[in-house]
A protein has these predicted regions:
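Catalytic domains of cell-wall/extracellular-matrix polysaccharide-remodeling enzymes
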Residues: 134-190, 248-268
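Active-site and substrate-binding clefts of carbohydrate-active enzymes
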Residues: 32-63, 70-72, 191-194, 202-203, ...
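N-terminal export leaders
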Residues: 5-9, 13
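CE4/NodB-like, metal-dependent polysaccharide N-deacetylase domain
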Residues: 126-155, 199, 230-246
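Short, well-structured secondary-structure segments
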Residues: 34-125, 131-135, 149-153, 172-178, ...
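Alpha-amylase-like alpha-glycosidases and glucanotransferases acting on alpha-linked glucans and related
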Residues: 184-232
Length: 314
């Protein structure tokens, strides 16, 4: 019996001695840091624009973008189409828009709402804000079966007075620029999640769009964008937030050849999906799985370029 105890004790000590360095090695092995890419695109044409202009935009931008993304169901993103443009495209290109509806239903795409005819919400009365938002909400819900939770703000013009109308129509969050947050003293390193604001006790959440990403997509080579995102992940950033004009992906000068013929968009998608440090998500999924970073009160403003363009000429 005494010998059995000695053997058991020796075995336990050996096991502990053997496992100790393995445990130490495991503790020294860093966990892979991941970042969530929240990618969103915004599509709009002025109400009453020439049909040939919209058709050109569809052939060089909307159509190839949707067809490319449709081939990668694991790449999740958000999209906003203004109401009247959506009507125009669904009437003239039903097959292409059916791809978008399919991606929404399979959870790949989140459609954002807004005012139906793309008004600056801060510039119209509360009752008209309600009507504009509800019109597009109903249109999107009837078309896809999914009620929108997010909204695009035209020209990213922010004024706290828009909060009640957005909340009253079921909108839980909007995207604004990181510039809005810089005006409150927030550092760029803190803008990797969403914040909350309120107006008369009514809550709305705010996602800060990264200017650094706006200037990189789609102009920097895809591998440089991937490296930039992975670098953010290594710094401990939780999310990289992008929401900008889809027309940059085909309509802007030289972008059609660059994005599609030369394969920039496919390279970006495949690089993101292949990276162990980057994941994609819809804004809705990220919002549901992460807590707010805190309360913020933004000044009345727009993105930095718009603030410059609206100044009086010397």
């Amino acid at each position: 019996m005494r010998e059995q105890r000695r053997c058991l004790l020796a075995s336990t000590c050996l096991s502990s001695a053997f496992l100790r360095p393995l445990r130490a090695a495991a503790l020294k092995t860093p966990m892979t840091q991941t970042i969530t890419l929240l990618l969103g695109v915004h599509a709009h044409q002025p109400v009453g624009n020439f049909p040939e202009v919209i058709e050109d935009a569809h052939q060089r931008c909307y159509k190839p973008f949707l067809h490319t993304l449709h081939a990668y169901p694991d790449f999740r993103f958000a999209a906003h189409f203004s109401g009247w443009l959506l009507d125009w495209l669904r009437e003239r290109h039903p097959a292409d828009m059916a791809l978008l509806a399919e991606m929404v239903r399979r959870g790949q795409v989140e459609l954002f709402s807004s005012g139906d005819t793309e008004p600056v919400l801060a510039a119209i009365p509360h009752r008209d804000r309600i009507g504009q938002l509800q019109t597009l909400n109903d249109k999107l819900t009837a078309w896809t079966g999914v009620q929108p939770s997010g909204a695009w703000l035209t020209e990213r013009v922010w004024e706290s007075a828009v909060v009640p109308a957005l909340a009253a129509t079921g909108i839980r969050y909007v995207t604004v620029d990181d510039y809005h947050f810089f005006c409150t003293g927030q550092p760029a390193t803190a803008l990797d999640g969403y914040f909350s604001t309120e107006e008369d006790g009514t809550r709305l959440d705010l996602f800060p769009i990264s200017e650094a990403l706006r200037y990189r997509l789609p102009f920097s080579p895809a591998h440089e964008v991937i490296a930039y995102l992975e670098g953010l992940a290594e710094q401990g950033q939780v999310a990289a937030i992008y929401f900008d004009d889809i027309e940059k992906f085909g309509i802007w000068p030289e972008t059609y050849d660059w994005v599609y013929h030369r394969g920039w968009l496919k390279a970006l998608i495949e690089g993101v999906l292949a990276s162990p440090k980057i994941r994609t998500a819809t804004y809705a999924d990220f919002h549901a799985g992460n807590a707010t970073r805190g309360i913020v009160y933004l000044p009345t403003t727009s993105y930095s370029e718009m603030n410059e363009w609206t100044l009086p000429m010397p």
